[in-house]
Structure formats: structure tokens, C-alpha cells
Swiss-Prot record:
Biological process annotations from GO: DNA recombination; DNA repair
Domain notes: Has 3 domains, the large (RuvB-L) and small ATPase (RuvB-S) domains and the C-terminal head (RuvB-H) domain. The head domain binds DNA, while the ATPase domains jointly bind ATP, ADP or are empty depending on the state of the subunit in the translocation cycle. During a single DNA translocation step the structure of each domain remains the same, but their relative positions change.
Catalytic activity: ATP + H2O = ADP + phosphate + H(+)
Keyword DNA-binding: yes
Keyword S-adenosyl-L-methionine applies: no
UniProt xrefs under InterPro entries: AAA+_ATPase (IPR003593), AAA_lid_4 (IPR041445), DNA_helicase_Holl-junc_RuvB (IPR004605), P-loop_NTPase (IPR027417), RuvB-like_N (IPR008824), RuvB_C (IPR008823), WH-like_DNA-bd_sf (IPR036388), WH_DNA-bd_sf (IPR036390)
EC number: 3.6.4.-
Protein's job: The RuvA-RuvB-RuvC complex processes Holliday junction (HJ) DNA during genetic recombination and DNA repair, while the RuvA-RuvB complex plays an important role in the rescue of blocked DNA replication forks via replication fork reversal (RFR). RuvA specifically binds to HJ cruciform DNA, conferring on it an open structure. The RuvB hexamer acts as an ATP-dependent pump, pulling dsDNA into and through the RuvAB complex. RuvB forms 2 homohexamers on either side of HJ DNA bound by 1 or 2 RuvA tetramers; 4 subunits per hexamer contact DNA at a time.
Record-listed ATP binding positions: 23-24, 65, 68-70, 131-133, 174, 184, 221
Name recorded for this polypeptide: Holliday junction branch migration complex subunit RuvB
Species per Swiss-Prot/TrEMBL record: Pseudomonas putida (strain GB-1)
Enzyme class: hydrolase
Family: Belongs to the RuvB family.
CDD domains reported in the protein's UniProt record: AAA
Length: 348
């Protein structure tokens, strides 16, 4: 199973990038949720504009689908400048980065997604560009090679990553602003769904928007994807209007339950309960039992279930918590009762 194949996958898809562009907010006033980030960025941007300076280099990190690219575009829009976008894996050689840097206008934003995947040689070129707005380029080869310095206009680098821990210390230290995006509340997601529906010209009730939001795993990208699929259902079977009942029937048909779990999530939890008595079970045994790769369990399935308190990692293996039994309407084993060995999701 591949993450991108799942309806509730947080990772993006190429076609969605085009679709999301139409509903993406362009200003901080339209940016929903993340109140601390929004307030801080409004302050930093206003101060930079007041001094006629470029904004400090900004690092945005957090789980996929929370709006890192959206925030980068908002920064450029609020600063009144252009944004040039690329990603870490695309910048394979120093020349690739140099070409982008030399095409920037004063105060422009250079957005690098997946910045943790920059190659070391490209990262070395980025250091003086960020710090001194200079580009060191090697001309020629062998004994005749020489280094020349090119002055760059002041610019803002906005880096986005889902894995801030993989950034090297020298790169991380060069960002003057660091922002972490958190999962969204159901209320904020419902507002996002209603806004997207309005832009798309869809008739949606508040309860219909909330029904989609509460199954979107705290992630705007998933909420907007579910909205499109519920729209299909509403147009064919619901007279074009998205009510709570229509959203519920559509999402049940799509196999997304009230907690945002899909078939793969439920299969993992039920396998642990039915075949391994709730655990502890090693990840290799679990992978064999559900015919998945180990990394799929660790990188795709587990994170959300752990974050929601349905699975724990312990020194002896994975265990399900009492929440998993309650979700399926099963009797809770005595060891998972109040004060049991695994009753607290944060313990290991």
C-alpha cells in the first residue's frame, strides 16, 4: 500500500496542486487556524515592510497537509513580492540553486519545499547566500579553476519540512523565524470546508461542513479532498446540497469512519486485537500479519493512530489502548482498565 493511494493520505498529489490553487488563501486575514503563527507572521511582515527590508529567512515545519506551501505564498503576497518555488530533491547541483538565486528580484521569496532533502553540496552554496547575500561559484576545472563571488539582492528563503530534526544545525541556525504548524481543530476545519465550498460554488450546511471536518484528521488537505468526493455524492444522490446526512452517507461509502480511520487503519487495530491479544507485538510480526511493509506501518499507518492515542510503542512492542476497544465496541480487557499497564497513552 502506498500513502498517496489513500483517500485520507496527508501527502499531496500532482492534480490536487492545481485544484488547491483555486481555493488557497492569499492573505493572513483569510488564513484560518494557527492563531499564534498568524499573529507572529503579521507582526514580522509589518515590521519588515516598515523598514523596507526583506523578511528574515523563515522555516516552517509540521506534518504534511497543514498549509506550509500556502503560508509561504501568503508571506510573498503580504510582502508584495514574487515567490519562486522549488524543492530539495530537485536542486541536485549547485548550479540549479545558483540559477534560481540569480533570477530573484529584491525582497523576493524563494520557497524550498522538503528542504531537509537538500544535498550537502547544494546546502554549502546556500549558506553564504542566506547570510551575506553572496553566491560563491567555481569557474573552470582542475588547476585553472577559480572562485568568484556574485552579489545577490536581499531575499527571503522560506523552507518547509515535515522532518525538522533532519536539518543540519548550520542550516537550521540561519533561519531567523521558525514556525511550527499544528493539527487543526474540527471547528477551524469546518470553517475551511465552508470557505472552500463557497469558492467552488457548492451548497453546504454548517453541520455538513462539520461532518467532513471531524473525519479529516486535523488536516486541511484531507478536508478539501473529502469535500470534493462528498460533492460528487451530493450531485448524484443528494440534490446537490451537502447536508450532515449526505456527508455522513458519502463518507461511509468512501469507508472513512467518524474518527477519520479508513480500512487500513481499522485492519491494523483489529489485527492487533484479534491475533495478538492487543499486544505487545513486534512490528515485523505485525507487518507479516497484515501483508504490509514494515516502513508502511511505521511511516504511514502508525503516526496518526499513536497521535490519537489508539496505539503505543513500548519496549516490548506495539500495544493497542482502551480507546481501540471502545472504537470497535469491544469489551476492554482488565489490564487496560483504569490504572492498567497501558491505560496512559503517553507512557512506554
Amino acid at each position: 500500500m502506498i500513502e498517496a493511494d489513500r483517500l485520507i493520505a496527508a501527502s499531496g498529489r500532482d492534480r490536487e496542486e492545481v485544484q488547491d490553487r483555486a481555493i488557497r488563501p492569499l492573505s493572513l486575514d483569510d488564513y484560518i487556524g494557527q492563531p499564534v503563527v498568524r499573529e507572529q507572521m503579521a507582526l514580522f511582515i509589518q515590521a519588515a515592510r516598515g523598514r523596507s527590508e526583506s523578511l528574515d529567512h523563515t522555516l516552517i515545519f509540521g506534518p504534511p497537509g497543514l498549509g506550509k506551501t500556502t503560508l509561504a505564498n501568503i508571506i510573498a503576497h503580504e510582502m508584495g513580492v514574487s515567490v519562486k518555488s522549488t524543492s530539495g530533491p530537485i536542486l541536485e547541483r549547485p548550479g540549479d540553486l545558483a540559477a534560481m538565486l540569480t533570477n530573484l528580484e529584491p525582497h523576493d521569496v524563494l520557497f524550498i519545499d522538503e528542504i531537509h532533502r537538500l544535498s550537502p553540496v547544494v546546502e554549502e552554496v546556500l549558506y553564504p547566500a542566506m547570510e551575506d547575500f553572496q553566491l560563491d561559484i567555481m569557474i573552470g576545472e582542475g588547476p585553472a579553476a577559480r572562485s568568484i563571488k556574485l552579489d545577490l539582492p536581499p531575499f527571503t528563503l522560506v523552507g518547509a519540512t515535515t522532518r525538522a530534526g533532519m536539518l543540519t544545525n548550520p542550516l537550521r541556525d540561519r533561519f531567523g523565524i521558525v514556525q511550527r504548524l499544528e493539527f487543526y481543530s474540527d471547528k477551524d476545519l469546518a470553517t475551511i470546508v465552508s470557505r472552500s465550498a463557497n469558492i467552488l460554488g457548492l451548497a453546504i450546511e454548517d453541520l455538513g461542513a462539520y461532518e467532513i471536518a471531524r473525519r479529516a484528521r486535523g488536516t486541511p488537505r484531507i478536508a478539501n479532498r473529502l469535500l470534493r468526493r462528498v460533492r460528487d455524492y451530493a450531485e448524484v444522490r443528494g440534490k446537490g446540497q451537502i447536508t450532515k446526512a449526505v456527508a455522513d452517507m458519502a463518507l461511509n461509502l468512501l469507508d472513512v469512519d467518524e474518527r477519520g480511520f479508513d480500512h487500513s487503519d481499522r485492519r491494523l487495530l483489529l489485527t492487533m486485537i484479534e491475533k495478538f491479544d492487543g499486544g505487545p507485538v513486534g512490528v515485523d510480526n505485525l507487518a507479516a500479519a497484515i501483508s504490509e511493509e514494515r516502513h508502511t506501518i511505521e511511516d504511514v499507518l502508525e503516526p496518526y493512530l499513536i497521535q490519537q492515542g489508539y496505539i503505543m510503542r513500548t519496549p516490548r512492542g506495539r500495544v493497542v489502548t482502551r480507546h481501540a476497544y471502545l472504537h470497535f465496541g469491544l469489551n476492554i480487557p482488565g489490564r487496560l482498565g483504569e490504572g492498567g499497564d497501558f491505560s496512559e497513552p503517553g507512557d512506554e
